[in-house]
């Protein structure tokens, strides 16, 4: 499946990203190759293979979920330029963002 430069530009605009025409062309080519690879994988016969089967021989190793004392809030907010009731205020980046 071919991804067009127009589609890349459309998604970039939705994401508030700007790309040069060269970058847009490169992204379109790269994304088309990725979609082609996924389409190729869809052709693999997985009959009888459990959905949770993996080819990797690894197990997920997670650390214990133990609560730890965090950093002092006032110390964290010491260098924050604009705050409101322990929320960091940042400029709105979306149109009609209001006071978000």
Curated annotation (Swiss-Prot):
Gene Ontology MF: a single term: glutaminyl-tRNA synthase (glutamine-hydrolyzing) activity
InterPro entries, sorted: Asp/Glu-ADT_sf_sub_c, GatC
UniProtKB keywords: ATP-binding, Ligase, Nucleotide-binding, Protein biosynthesis
Enzyme class name: ligase
EC number of the protein: 6.3.5.-
Gene Ontology terms describing biological process: glutaminyl-tRNAGln biosynthesis via transamidation; regulation of translational fidelity; translation
Catalytic activity entry: L-glutamyl-tRNA(Gln) + L-glutamine + ATP + H2O = L-glutaminyl-tRNA(Gln) + L-glutamate + ADP + phosphate + H(+); L-aspartyl-tRNA(Asn) + L-glutamine + ATP + H2O = L-asparaginyl-tRNA(Asn) + L-glutamate + ADP + phosphate + 2 H(+)
Family to which this protein belongs: Belongs to the GatC family.
Subunit structure as annotated in this protein's UniProt entry: Heterotrimer of A, B and C subunits.
NCBIfam families reported for this sequence: gatC (TIGR00135)
Function: Allows the formation of correctly charged Asn-tRNA(Asn) or Gln-tRNA(Gln) through the transamidation of misacylated Asp-tRNA(Asn) or Glu-tRNA(Gln) in organisms which lack either or both of asparaginyl-tRNA or glutaminyl-tRNA synthetases. The reaction takes place in the presence of glutamine and ATP through an activated phospho-Asp-tRNA(Asn) or phospho-Glu-tRNA(Gln).
Name of the protein in question: Aspartyl/glutamyl-tRNA(Asn/Gln) amidotransferase subunit C
Provenance organism: Streptococcus thermophilus (strain ATCC BAA-491 / LMD-9)
Primary gene name: gatC
């Amino acid at each position: 499946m071919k991804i067009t430069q127009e589609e890349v530009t459309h998604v970039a605009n939705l994401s508030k990203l700007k790309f040069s025409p060269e970058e847009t062309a490169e992204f379109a080519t790269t994304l088309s190759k990725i979609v082609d690879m996924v389409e190729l994988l869809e052709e693999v016969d997985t009959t009888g293979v459990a959905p949770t089967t993996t080819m990797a021989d690894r197990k997920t190793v997670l650390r214990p979920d133990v609560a730890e004392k965090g950093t002092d809030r006032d110390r964290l907010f010491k260098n924050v330029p604009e705050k409101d009731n322990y929320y960091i205020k940042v400029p709105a980046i979306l149109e009609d963002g209001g006071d978000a």
